[in-house]
């Protein structure tokens, strides 16, 4: 029965051949042609050709090996095979915050951008202030929340930009900005003068103790104190700056100069705002009358940028120790406010953490003044500025026999002839961060000027920021 059915099918499929031959049988060539099976596999010549993914896998189901032959690249084969087997797991864009998705067999992998983590990059990695200052241009703090996000803020005269990171000025002459390129620094040491004591005035300090406005009589320039607390008589051991470059108008706009009753310059200072000048406590006893000049860059020339101001009140830190120069800091309240310009601008006050963790971890700071051009030399006619590297604390302590307290730090060069010198005392030590200059220290004391193996010693402002801000509120 099956044979008859097959015969009928053959007859139906080949009516022309049957009629042509007039019988049941057909020629061998025709029969072979009809019964020949078409192979799916490549012919010999096709096997010699490079694989084709369309031919190998899209026309019919293929194996991974056939796909590899088509791509001739393991990585591309894996990418294709993962989608070919079970579809593209990345088609739904599962990776958040710009993460890149890579398909797998029954799964996917997200490569997250910096700052994000999780299977789908869905979690924001909290930034910390110790890492690149939290990307803040100025101050950085950690928000007290579950994720502990970074919060940026700005010093006085600035406000946060829309990005929450940058600080933009909201005043005409913002602190810490130099409108012209700057040159290096120099330092001055107060000259000897007789002074008379005046009345004291008390104001509350941050710790509840009494802050005194004090003038004491002295006939000597300040010298660094020995470790045993007694004074030393070496006339070459003085407070100071040496070997800087000239500071042109507007390049050191926060520089202030203290003038005695004879019209002589004896110390430096830093402009903090229109009412207050920061200086060293040991400068205060150098004259019974103090005036402050700002905007000056040449002692023998009228630049028409300088103005002179009278000291109304003087605040010396209540814990200042003259024998050791500890807590060597004072503030001068001016009777007439300073008018700011492109030549006269205050330096910025930092926050303590910002000063300690960011500013003082910079390579160097800047000091400026009209100090002596070399040890026992004459005072500089021109304002000078000098870059001074921060010095490791242990190196600083090992370089001197005098006490280096927690309220001091060292800066300068071990062998180069560059340093602060006599007459620069009380002057500014500022540090630049993202084109803004912040006060980091006060020129305090040193052993000679630019001596080999010796460094300049500065009052560490971050230890006194609360005190400074408390006094500046005493208007």
Curated annotation (Swiss-Prot):
Q: Which residues carry this modification: 4-carboxyglutamate?
A: 46-47, 54, 56, 59-60, 65-66, 69, 72, 79
Which GO terms of type biological process are on file?
Answer: blood coagulation; positive regulation of TOR signaling; proteolysis
Which residues does the record annotate as propeptide? 21-40, 186-240
Enumerate the residue ranges of region (Disordered): 216-237
All disulfide bonds of the chain are 57-62, 90-101, 95-110, 112-121, 129-140, 136-152, 154-167, 175-348, 247-252, 267-283, 396-410, 421-449
Query: Where is it predominantly found?
Result: secreted
Q: Which reaction does it catalyse?
A: Selective cleavage of Arg-|-Thr and then Arg-|-Ile bonds in prothrombin to form thrombin
Report domain Gla positions.
41-85
Please describe the quaternary structure of this protein.
The two chains are formed from a single-chain precursor by the excision of two Arg residues and are held together by 1 or more disulfide bonds.
In Swiss-Prot or TrEMBL terms, this protein is called: Coagulation factor X
Q: Which organism is it from?
A: Gallus gallus
């Amino acid at each position: 029965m099956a044979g008859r059915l097959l015969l009928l099918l053959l007859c139906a499929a080949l009516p022309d051949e049957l009629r042509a031959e007039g019988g049941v049988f057909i020629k061998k060539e025709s029969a072979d042609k009809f019964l020949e099976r078409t192979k799916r596999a490549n012919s010999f010549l096709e096997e010699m050709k490079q694989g084709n993914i369309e031919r190998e896998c899209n026309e019919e189901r293929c194996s991974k090996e056939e796909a590899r032959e088509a791509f001739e690249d393991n990585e591309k084969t894996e990418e294709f095979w993962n989608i070919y087997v079970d579809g593209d797991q990345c088609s739904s864009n599962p990776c958040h915050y710009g993460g890149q998705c890579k398909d797998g067999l029954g799964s996917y992998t997200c490569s997250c951008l910096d700052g994000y983590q999780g299977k789908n990059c869905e979690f924001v990695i909290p930034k910390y202030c110790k890492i690149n200052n939290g990307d803040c241009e100025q101050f950085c703090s950690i928000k007290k929340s579950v994720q502990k996000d970074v919060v940026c803020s700005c010093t006085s005269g600035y406000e946060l930009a829309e990005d929450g990171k940058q600080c933009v000025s909201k005043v005409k002459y913002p602190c810490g900005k130099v409108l012209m390129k700057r040159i290096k620094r120099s330092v001055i040491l107060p000259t000897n003068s007789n002074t008379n004591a005046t009345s004291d005035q008390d104001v509350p300090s941050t710790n509840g103790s009494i802050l005194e406005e004090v003038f004491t009589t002295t006939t000597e320039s300040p010298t660094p104190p020995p470790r045993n607390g007694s004074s030393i008589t070496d006339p070459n051991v003085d407070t100071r700056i040496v070997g800087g470059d000239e500071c042109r108008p507007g390049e050191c706009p926060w520089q202030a100069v203290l003038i005695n009753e004879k019209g002589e310059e004896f110390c430096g200072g830093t402009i903090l705002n229109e009412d207050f000048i920061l200086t060293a406590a040991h400068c205060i006893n150098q004259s019974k009358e103090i005036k402050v000049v700002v905007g000056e860059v040449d002692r023998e020339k009228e630049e028409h940028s300088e103005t002179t101001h009278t000291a109304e009140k003087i605040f010396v830190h209540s814990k200042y120790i003259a024998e050791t120069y500890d807590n060597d800091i004072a503030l001068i309240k001016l009777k007439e406010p300073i008018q700011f310009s492109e030549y006269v601008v205050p330096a910025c006050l930092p926050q303590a953490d910002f000063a300690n963790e960011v500013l003082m971890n910079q390579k160097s700071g800047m000091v400026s003044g009209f100090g002596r051009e070399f040890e026992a030399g004459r005072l500089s006619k021109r304002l000078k500025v000098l870059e001074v590297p921060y010095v490791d604390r242990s190196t600083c302590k090992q370089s001197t026999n005098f006490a280096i307290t927690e309220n001091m730090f060292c800066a300068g060069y071990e062998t180069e002839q560059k340093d602060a010198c006599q007459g620069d005392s009380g002057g500014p030590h500022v540090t630049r961060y993202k084109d803004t200059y912040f006060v980091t220290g006060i020129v305090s004391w040193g052993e000679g000027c630019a001596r080999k193996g010796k460094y300049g010693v500065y009052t560490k402002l971050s230890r006194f920021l609360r005190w400074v801000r408390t006094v500046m509120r005493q208007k």
